[in-house]
Amino acid sequence: MAVEYVCCSPNFFIHIAVIVFLVLFAGLMSGLTLGLMSLSLVDLEVLAKSGTPEHRKYAAKILPVVKNQHLLLVTLLICNAAAMETLPIFLDGLVTAWGAILISVTLILLFGEIIPQSICSRYGLAIGATVAPFVRVLVFICLPVAWPISKLLDFLLGHRRAALFRRAELKTLVDFHGNEAGKGGELTHDETTIIAGALELSEKMVKDAMTPISDIFVIDINAKLDRDLMNLILEKGHSRVPVYYEQPTNIIGLVLVKNLLTINPDEEIPVKNVTIRRIPRVPEILPLYDILNEFQKGLSHMAVVVRQCDKIHPLPSKNGSVKEARVDVDSEGTPTPQERMLRTKRSLQKWKSFPNRASSFKGGSKSKKWSKDNDADILQLNGNPLPKLAEEEEAVGIITMEDVIEELLQEEIFDETDHHFEDS
């Protein structure tokens, strides 16, 4: 039979104080269970490194506590259960049995669950950082019971993995943080566009950004730099002009327009007598990030895009004779992941196998090392045979550094000449 205490006696006030403490303690444990366990380690690490000064301080205090999440969870639940189970014992000395059950359920539901979880779900970071030392003490006290249970949970469920975003999810998250989304984000339209372009660039290939061969301005290596050709080059407004041999699709090099400033048009100097730089040839399936990395090395800011096709394979016929079949290697069919990886590896090998490339860019400064090997990328025409496309290759376009940057920005880049043509 429960002991009843007379109102206003010392034991009565002690029981009231204990009941209030148990309700508040249970509410704190319930709120921390929701507040701390809802904070992922990734979010806390981001706040600790790049949050506001206040959030950095909070995250630094919470991170050591929540690293062992199963141990923290078991500790909070044990403390919460102990407080809720003890509450009816002290209420039983003040009211009847049914009254103790009714009051304890009401107090726990209202002040031990609803209100604490509502507060901690919104201010969990600040509250968790404030009571972090107290939580450490609770973990130490409950360690004999909580540690074996947490290890069992680690064995059965494994450690909680970091909640990282996939590219599509990260792009959507960035869009939500833009000020155009109307959700209170601070990112401008240009910022969200560039970030989205950087995320999408890994899925794009050279053929998605190149200029088709039919839209390219090229000059013949045997042409003469007379006044008409010089005026045409200046009118196009390009800094680099591709040079072809025999047919426009057989692009063998490029001419820097700035190197033509000292040439007198009246002398009609042949193009082959000026400095012609080598131009790399890259497959159309080369990822844009790979060619961007090659462009950044400074070897060339322009490359010829080629397509592997028309390989001839002999096929036996019914009468024993051999027929020829042409196979388009770069068909539009969806390649398997293994094929895609193999194609990328071949693409990089083809870029790296470009003849006479300077190999001094594996590290360090590019200026002095490049000046020593500058002649290696100049096309030597002193009796040497001019390069030609292989039989199984077909030039389909030209790609420049500007094309890749446009895909990254997802906007067209215009210079003075482009605006001149648009206005006219």
Swiss-Prot record:
Subcellular locations according to the entry: Membrane
Main location: membrane
InterPro entries: ACDP, CBS_dom, CBS_dom_sf, CNNM, Ion_transp-like_CBS
Stretches assigned to the CBS domain: 210-271, 275-331, 355-416
GO cellular component terms, A-Z: plasma membrane
Signal peptide: none
Segments crossing the lipid bilayer: 12-32, 71-91, 95-115, 137-157
Entry keyword set: CBS domain, Glycoprotein, Membrane, Phosphoprotein, Repeat, Transmembrane, Transmembrane helix
Residue list for modification Phosphoserine: S331
Cytoplasmic side stretches: 33-70, 116-136
GO biological process, one term: magnesium ion homeostasis
Name of this protein: DUF21 domain-containing protein At4g33700
